[in-house]
């Protein structure tokens, strides 16, 4: 009974152990004979049971730890795929730290006689900076993989590197750790020495059937760092090349002691400063680099001090921009560096120009698309030109040439003066003479031949707009005189009068005069008579007498309609001139005078009478007289102001008044008291009617 109870009490022990097993390790326990099942059921009274249980849990823990490298490898792969959110160096440190703790825990369980405190399992932070990260590998961590599998794995990883895929080996650092079989040899080679292996600073430590290789690049490799690789050769096989790995030092830092890998530092060493200058404080590395190159070029050529940084950030004054625009285009297009002519071609005072150029560059270098000497040299050239002009103005020495624009107006806007243009050299004047710019006027201010041709073309174009359409505002003709009554004549006389009127119209339709020059500035030489004649011709060109609807040539009788005096011919009336009025412009008076001068040949030029064909015996002009008896017509003011708007306003007022009267009359019906009263009244009446109908039935 006691033994049975004792066995019954010890049966739940294995179940508890099996409950702690992980499900993915059951198959490995069932298949492998290396780990026998727990013997608590078969040998409950064995004295070596605690030791076996300890070994069992130790091996189980080693199996669990054997899966950690692959898990960390996958984690590193995903971290690199997602932009390096988790730094790989800290993951390596965490892996080594966890493995070291696990190994020390296994040693404590395998040797229970050795007592270690819990504090010994902690990894001091001060020791991490001194102890190498390879010490935990010397404790004998057994990787559950064969040498052939490891070699295939390395080859696969190196092939993945060729396709630029992010793998575990692709870590941007100048140091690393590799686990290789003992049959392989490792060496660091550069991209220049891929054919012959060169032994680099390697640290090889044997660990059973494997070798732990920790490599650290020499500073000498930094001179040709574009490509560094790891080459593994077989000692027996003929040196089969596995592959190489590209290492970029931009995101890592090599410790100066050259012994142990160190974490990244914010500051940089002096050697790294020489190879890669820091970014500009202005935040633009390209501009800083260009400025440094420019200053080095100036220092090498001129031998002066480096100028101070540009304070205006590349902007220059308007005068310097004008100097750039006024440079000789041939020198700028051929060679910008040779924009300044040699000293032999210039006058003697220009020999000191290089020194001035250097001083200007050292004080305020300007950033432009050309070299920095160009604007300064041009400015000095202009200053020297002005100085020579001032000093040699009274002497017969040749004046230094100043680059000017071919267009005089643009050159004047850019700062040139007429005196500078007159004082230009002979070569420059010959250039102006070879290709003169036709501005439309000769030297004497008269019109040139090209301008005359253009005027003829413009006149032809203007005449094309004049049509016979009487309703065209540009073709409206009307005389500036009143119509006169003409005595009846023979058809021949009427024909002559009509031809005379047509002659006047034809003379008015003459070609447009040539417009005088208003921009030449010689207003004092103009004659007023010639100007008036030209203006009169121009005014008459717009007046076409054959168009009765032309506002500029309107004709109307100046006297009221009256009885036609027939059968009377007054010789004095024929000599009377038609009444011509002058408008608000002087041109109208000129027109009227010309028409009055033609009155003898054409006494009746009225278009309306000519078209109607009416003939009158004589022409009589009525005078305005005042009668003593005047007929007055009285019109009521109210009737005069009547209109539709007044009717509408009156109707609106009436409608508003009616609305107000209606509201006063029936507005109380809409009140609540009245409605309630009427409701009660109707309800009582409805009840009475209902009772009356029931009684009647």
Swiss-Prot record:
Keyword Phosphoprotein: yes
Any one GO CC term of the record: protein phosphatase type 1 complex
Leader sequence segment: none
A Pfam family assignment: PP1c_bdg
Phosphoprotein found in the keyword field: yes
Record's compositionally biased regions (Basic and acidic residues): 345-354
GO molecular function: protein phosphatase regulator activity
Feature: compositional bias, Acidic residues: 423-442, 522-531
Keywords: Phosphoprotein, Translation regulation
Phosphoserine: modified positions: 197, 199, 492
GO biological process: ER overload response; regulation of translational initiation; response to endoplasmic reticulum stress; response to hydrogen peroxide; response to oxidative stress
Phenotype reported upon loss of the gene: Mice are born at the expected Mendelian ratio, but exhibit severe growth retardation and impaired erythropoiesis. None survive the first day of postnatal life. PPP1R15A-PPP1R15B double-knockout embryos do not develop past the preimplantation period.
Superkingdom assignment: Eukaryota
Region span, Disordered: 328-354, 417-456, 486-531
InterPro entries to which the protein is assigned, alphabetical: PPP1R15, Prot_Pase1_reg-su15A/B_C, Prot_Pase1_reg-su15B_N
Its biological purpose: Maintains low levels of EIF2S1 phosphorylation in unstressed cells by promoting its dephosphorylation by PP1.
Family, similarity comment: Belongs to the PPP1R15 family.
Name the UniProt record assigns to this protein: Protein phosphatase 1 regulatory subunit 15B
Natural source organism: Mus musculus (Mouse)
């Amino acid at each position: 009974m006691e033994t049975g109870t004792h066995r019954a009490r010890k049966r739940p022990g294995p179940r508890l152990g099996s409950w702690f097993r992980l499900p993915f390790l059951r198959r490995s326990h069932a298949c492998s004979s290396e780990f026998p099942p727990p013997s608590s059921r078969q040998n409950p009274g064995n004295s070596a049971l605690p030791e076996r249980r300890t070994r069992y849990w130790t091996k189980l823990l080693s199996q669990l730890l054997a899966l950690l490298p692959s898990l960390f490898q996958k984690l590193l792969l995903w971290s690199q795929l997602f932009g390096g959110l988790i730094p790989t160096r800290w993951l390596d440190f965490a892996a080594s730290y966890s493995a070291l703790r696990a190994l020390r825990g296994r040693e404590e369980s395998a040797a229970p006689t050795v007592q270690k405190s819990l504090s010994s399992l902690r990894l001091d932070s001060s020791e991490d900076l001194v102890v190498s990260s390879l010490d935990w590998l010397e404790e004998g961590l057994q990787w559950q993989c064969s040498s052939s599998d490891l070699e295939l794995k390395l080859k696969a990883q190196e092939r993945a590197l060729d396709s630029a895929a992010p793998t575990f080996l692709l870590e941007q650092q100048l140091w690393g750790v590799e686990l290789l079989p003992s049959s392989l040899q490792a060496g660091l080679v550069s991209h220049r020495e891929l054919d012959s292996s060169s032994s680099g600073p390697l640290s090889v430590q044997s660990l059973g059937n494997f070798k732990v290789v920790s490599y650290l690049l020499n500073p000498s490799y930094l001179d040709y760092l574009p490509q560094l690789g790891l080459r593994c050769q077989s000692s027996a096989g003929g040196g089969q090349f596995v592959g190489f790995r590209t290492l970029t030092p931009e995101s890592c830092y090599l410790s100066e002691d050259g012994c142990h890998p160190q974490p990244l530092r914010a500051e940089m060493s002096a050697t790294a400063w020489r190879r890669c200058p820091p970014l500009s404080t202005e935040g633009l590395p390209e501009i800083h680099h260009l400025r440094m190159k420019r200053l080095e070029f100036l220092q090498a050529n001129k031998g002066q001090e480096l100028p101070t940084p540009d304070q205006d950030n590349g902007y220059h004054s308007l005068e310097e921009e004008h100097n750039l625009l006024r440079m000789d285009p041939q020198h700028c297009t051929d060679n910008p560096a040779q924009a300044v002519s040699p000293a032999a071609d210039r006058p003697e005072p220009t020999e000191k120009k290089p020194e001035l150029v250097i001083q200007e560059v050292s004080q305020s270098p300007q950033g432009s698309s050309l070299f920095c000497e160009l604007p300064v040299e041009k400015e000095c050239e202009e200053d020297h030109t002005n100085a020579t002009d001032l000093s040699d103005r009274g002497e017969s020495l040749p004046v230094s040439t100043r680059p000017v624009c071919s267009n005089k107006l643009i050159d004047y806007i850019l700062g040139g003066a007429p005196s500078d243009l007159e004082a230009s050299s002979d070569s420059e004047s010959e250039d102006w003479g070879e290709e003169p710019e036709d501005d439309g006027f000769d030297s004497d201010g008269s019109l040139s031949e090209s301008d005359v041709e253009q005027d003829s073309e413009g006149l032809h174009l203007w005449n094309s707009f004049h049509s016979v359409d009487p309703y065209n505002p540009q073709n409206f003709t009307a005389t500036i005189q009143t119509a006169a009554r003409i005595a009846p004549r023979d058809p021949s006389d009427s024909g002559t009068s009509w031809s005379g009127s047509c002659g006047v119209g034809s003379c008015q339709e003459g070609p447009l005069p040539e417009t005088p020059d208003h921009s030449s500035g010689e207003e004092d030489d103009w004659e007023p008579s010639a100007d008036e004649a030209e203006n009169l011709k121009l005014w008459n060109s717009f007046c076409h007498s054959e168009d009765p609807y032309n506002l500029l040539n309107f004709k109307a009788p100046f006297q009221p309609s009256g009885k036609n005096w027939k059968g009377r011919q007054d010789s004095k009336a024929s000599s009377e001139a038609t009444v011509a009025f002058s408008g608000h412009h002087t041109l109208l008076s000129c027109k009227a005078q010309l028409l009055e001068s033609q009155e003898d040949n054409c006494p009746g030029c009225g278009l309306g009478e000519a078209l109607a064909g009416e003939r009158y015996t004589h022409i009589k002009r009525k005078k305005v007289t005042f009668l003593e008896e005047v007929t007055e017509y009285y019109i009521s003011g109210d009737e005069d102001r009547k209109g539709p708007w007044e009717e509408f306003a009156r109707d609106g007022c009436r409608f508003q008044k009616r609305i107000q009267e209606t509201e006063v009359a029936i507005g109380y019906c809409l009140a609540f008291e009245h409605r309630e009263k009427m409701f009660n009244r109707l309800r009582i009446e409805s009840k009475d009617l209902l009772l009356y109908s029931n009684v009647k039935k």
